[in-house]
Amino acid sequence: HAVHIPHDEL
Amino acid sequence: MNIFRFLGDISHLSAIIILLLKIWKSRSCAGISGKSQLLFAIVFTTRYLDLFTNFISFYNTSMKVVYVASSYATVWMIYSKFKATYDGNHDTFRVEFLIVPTAILSFLVNHDFTPLEILWTFSIYLESVAILPQLFMVSKTGEAETITSHYLFALGIYRTLYLFNWIWRYQFEEFFDLIAIVAGLVQTVLYCDFFYLYITKVLKGKKLSLPA
């Protein structure tokens, strides 16, 4: 599974 | 960052500050659902566990700190400092009906089966229904103080603006997060009848009263 991008939203 | 997300964050921050000031200045949490505030504290705690491990920007980190600190301060004022004014008889929504299903769903539908990601997903699902005890309490008491309706309006508008932010990001950044979008839609839909009452009543200077 693609490395999930870190959540950049509050 | 885009204008919709920025305005959404400002709206969210102002809702939090409106509530803090209302309780602190009036030294009363009448009409406020402690259960919803507890749920919001859980939402921020489970969502911002990466506060120290994942630096996005100064803005991102400082807003997270403010959200977590203010949500705990609000819970403390309701259940400790001004607990004598807490209207527990009308704050009777069964929060376990919100916590358990969202916790189970976060295990079943998520982006990554890792602790941080499952907690983030749980926080997204929980936030979408966290206002229900408050809306339930307003419908039970049949009315809400005007300041409380301003709080609810700002809180509802924040996620509505985030919906536009996700349209923007899909269009210009080819980014979209289906979990956040679906939960955000549910969250916004739950406010619809309140938005209607707020726009037709409160903005005309009347008190917000629900047909009991």
Curated annotation (Swiss-Prot), chain B:
Belongs to the ERD2 family. Residues 47-48, 159-169 are annotated as: Interaction with the K-D-E-L motif on target proteins. InterPro entries: ER_ret_rcpt. The chain crosses the membrane at residues 5-24, 33-52, 59-79, 93-110, 117-135, 150-168, 179-199. Residues 204-207 are annotated as: Important for recycling of cargo proteins with the sequence motif K-D-E-L from the Golgi to the endoplasmic reticulum. The record marks R5, E117 as: Interaction with the K-D-E-L motif on target proteins. It is a multi-pass membrane protein. One of its GO terms (cellular component) is COPI-coated vesicle membrane. The record marks D193 as: Important for recycling of cargo proteins with the sequence motif K-D-E-L from the Golgi to the endoplasmic reticulum. GO terms for molecular function: ER retention sequence binding; KDEL sequence binding. PROSITE patterns: ER_LUMEN_RECEPTOR_1, ER_LUMEN_RECEPTOR_2. It is found in: Golgi apparatus membrane; Cytoplasmic vesicle, COPI-coated vesicle membrane; Endoplasmic reticulum membrane; Endoplasmic reticulum-Golgi intermediate compartment membrane. Receptor for the C-terminal sequence motif K-D-E-L that is present on endoplasmic reticulum resident proteins and that mediates their recycling from the Golgi back to the endoplasmic reticulum. Keywords: Cytoplasmic vesicle, Endoplasmic reticulum, ER-Golgi transport, Golgi apparatus, Membrane, Protein transport, Receptor, Transmembrane, Transmembrane helix, Transport. Residues 25-32, 80-92, 136-149, 200-212 are cytoplasmic. The keyword Protein transport applies. It comes from Xenopus laevis. This is ER lumen protein-retaining receptor 1-B. Residues 1-4, 53-58, 111-116, 169-178 are lumenal. GO terms for biological process: protein retention in ER lumen; protein transport; retrograde vesicle-mediated transport, Golgi to endoplasmic reticulum.
